[in-house]
Amino acid sequence: VVAAAVCLVCIPRTAHADETIRSPGAHPDYSVEIEPHFVIGDDSVFASAGYGVGARFGIPIVRNGFVPSINNSVAINFGIDLVHYDQCYYLTTGCGANYLLFPVALQWNFFVARQFSVYAEGGIFLYKGFVSDTVCAGNVCAGSPSDFGVLPAFAVGGRWHFSDHVALNLRVGYPTVTLGVSFW
């Protein structure tokens, strides 16, 4: 009896994989995801990457996603980012700019484990740039990014769910990389 008890305690049990991805709908049931975040902006407009803050909001539109046999969902994601840039590419003297970015994307979420989810998103972002007035004596320089426009946006990301309603969120894409916290 003692030997049997020792064997039961000492012999490792077979680990069971997290079956979250194979359980459709086994993800947070939410009406909105709120994600405040820090932003690193793309460096293709200025000589260095930008930095700032922002927020995203996700509204689920398909609870069980496009693949009914796995745990996935689809949401519309939109938000606002304020990004500051230094060192304009078109001048050798110091200059800077601030950008307001308004992303709108379709986000496809995959809940791969109880504490981890990944996603891909694609859409557009509207932007408005404000270059410092001292850069061009109050005028918009030729080739200056101080304007309004629309460009494509795409990203992949992951969330570490450290509770049922809060997750650390990393998004890597164009035009920004963000690190924030998601609340459901």
Identify the meaning behind each predicted range:
Residues 6-15:
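C-terminal segment of classical bacterial N-terminal signal peptides
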Residues 16-63, 85, 173-175, 180-184:
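Short glycine/proline- and aromatic-enriched beta-strand/turn motifs that initiate or cap beta-hairpins
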Residues 18-31, 62-74, 111-118, 162-166:
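Short loop/turn motifs that connect adjacent beta-strands in outer-membrane beta-barrel proteins
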Residues 19-22, 27-30, 140-184:
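Predominantly the C-terminal beta-signal and adjacent terminal strand-loop region
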Residues 30-32, 47-53, 72, 96-102, ...:
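Residues that define the transmembrane beta-barrel architecture of outer-membrane proteins
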Residues 36-40, 53-59, 80-82, 102-108, ...:
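Residues on the lipid-exposed face of transmembrane beta-strands in outer-membrane beta-barrel proteins
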Residues 42-46, 61-65, 84-90, 112, ...:
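Gram-negative outer-membrane beta-barrel proteins
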Residues 82-97, 128-148:
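Flexible, solvent-exposed loop segments that connect beta-strands
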